[in-house]
Every structure is written in C-alpha cells, then in structure tokens.
C-alpha cells in the first residue's frame, strides 16, 4: 500500500517518539525528508540523523531525538500544507510560530529552509510544517 503523505508520516513518527521518550526513530528515506531533517538539525530540534542503506534500493533514515532536562526539545510539530490542501505563501506572509520562538519550514525555489532564511533570501514557497 502506498503512503499518501510521507512527510506527515515522518513528523508523526518524530512526535510519537518524543512523547514516548525514545532516543531515536526511523522512517523510510527520501530527499525531501532528508532536507527537512537538515533544517531541524541546524535549528537544534534534533541531534542528527543517519542514512541506513539496505542494499536493495531501499534506505531508511534513523533520527536521533534531542532532549533537554528530560523533556523533548520539540513541543509541537505539525504539517501545514497537506496533499489535499497545499498552502503557498509569499515572503511577506510567511507565518511566525509562537511569536518567533518556533520555526516554519518552507519548500522554496532555492531549496528547503526555515522561515528566517526565506525572509533573508526574499523568497516564498510552500509551507511544509511548523515546529515549536
């Protein structure tokens, strides 16, 4: 059976793993998922991730979750643009999460990036998810 929202599935695995205090979670690999994880890592929401290759054309991303004083660094993580309803924004209307304490991750013509990077580069795009 095919998955209709692979990115949403990855975000749900991260959310569930953090609520169960798992040290790491795994998800099937894709370029988009890896780019989103790059942003989460650079912004300090995860420790890191690694690609596990099974050799038959299948690979998996192992995501190391981050905790501070026993609590997950990620309080909320959710999908904004969904397969049935895509959300596109211009640079002027990029949403702020928790008055700038969280981030919005966008897919832009210049790549996947956080909201503050998109504002600096003056590009809009599809709002993938928000993290706080």
UniProtKB/Swiss-Prot annotation:
Transmembrane segments: none annotated. One of its GO terms (biological process) is translation. GO terms for cellular component: ribonucleoprotein complex; ribosome. The keyword RNA-binding applies. Gene3D superfamilies: 3.30.1370.30, 3.30.1490.10. It holds the Pfam family Ribosomal_S8. GO terms for molecular function: rRNA binding; structural constituent of ribosome. InterPro entries: Ribosomal_uS8 (IPR000630), Ribosomal_uS8_CS (IPR047863), Ribosomal_uS8_sf (IPR035987). Keywords: Ribonucleoprotein, Ribosomal protein, RNA-binding, rRNA-binding. The keyword Ribonucleoprotein applies. NCBIfam families: PRK00136.1. One of the primary rRNA binding proteins, it binds directly to 16S rRNA central domain where it helps coordinate assembly of the platform of the 30S subunit. Belongs to the universal ribosomal protein uS8 family. Part of the 30S ribosomal subunit. Contacts proteins S5 and S12. This is Small ribosomal subunit protein uS8. It comes from Rhizobium leguminosarum bv. trifolii (strain WSM2304).
